[in-house]
Amino acid sequence: MATDYHHGVRVIEINEGSRPIRTVSTAVLGLIATADDADPAAFPLDTPVLVTNVIAAMGKAGKTGTLYRSLSAIAAQTKPLTVVVRVAEGETEAETTTNAVGGVSPDGKYLGAQALLAAQSKLGVKPRILGAPGIDTQAVTNAMASVAQRLRAFVYASAYGCATVTAATAYRGQFGQREVMVIWPDFVNWDTAIDEEASISAVAYAMGLRAKIDEETGWHKTLSNVVVNGPTGLTQDVFFDLQDPATDAGVLNAKEVTTLINMGGYRFWGSRTCEAPGGFFYFENYTRTAQVLADTIAEAHFAFVDLPLHPSLVRDLLESINAKFRDLKRQGYIIDGHAWYDEQYNDKSGLKDGKLAIDYDYTPVPPLENLRFQQRITDRYLADFAARIAA
């Protein structure tokens, strides 16, 4: 011990001070898909599989079901880490929905969408961008939303089975989770399995594009108004006018449905989540900013748990968090943020019991959703007409 008698020199390492905080990885996909002819060794049923090369994985994904075309749509945008859970395609839509919703087997194995919860322990990655392209019925989307809340992830879901704007907006009303974005309609692209154009879930493209934006721009940028690679058309007509809200796109966006437009390339149009009215996380990036900050700050301070609770430890915690906020502000990920120690939440009985509360706030970066130019006609530029001629 340091207090024992010793006639000589001791060196004691002091590992204190603030520590750098690394932002959690966000461009990790969690894909639920069907493919009865997929390689069962590469994609076993109800088992999370880590795909590090989506293009190479397509060779073992089969051609039936949704897996192959979903991977193709993702690969057209970028090549992210993707956790794939293959579920059995039932003889009916209801059976497929049951398989995708999943649950827990008698021996404790997580099934369907629930298998994404096992990705962290089995694969060492946490899916942050979730979707079940082509099989995301209302029940599946609700199951995915529940998983997303536990993973601090975000779900992209189609307005399943909706053929009209009215139906799509009504469908959106079935959800109230900030972790969900509803998309309508779907894309059309070339299907190499049948040598002709066919519809494909826009959700697969949204997942790939979300990962691409995270990698190239950041999680503070919404999905909206970025060119999508691959689509050749839309499954439904969508009337869009940049300057007129009285359009199909305007109605959909007003009801928090992200739609698809073609303006210099196919794009998603809309940044709203399904959060219930009155909430704070109505923009996609507001939700994702909250998720990223929560996990980043919590995981960065795992090493602080069970250390001696000295005032110096609190100072180190605060400096670590505030240094991270300064860095995120400098890079444009947040407007600003600040952490502090509040005595009212840290009375002596709580401190004595080993409890510490650190407060912090932050301001996410709002997307420019509604740009207004105020155009005026004037005759003041005629006042010096003669001088302008002389010039």
Regions picked out by a protein language model, each given a short descriptive name:
Residues 1-391:
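Surface-exposed assembly/interface segments
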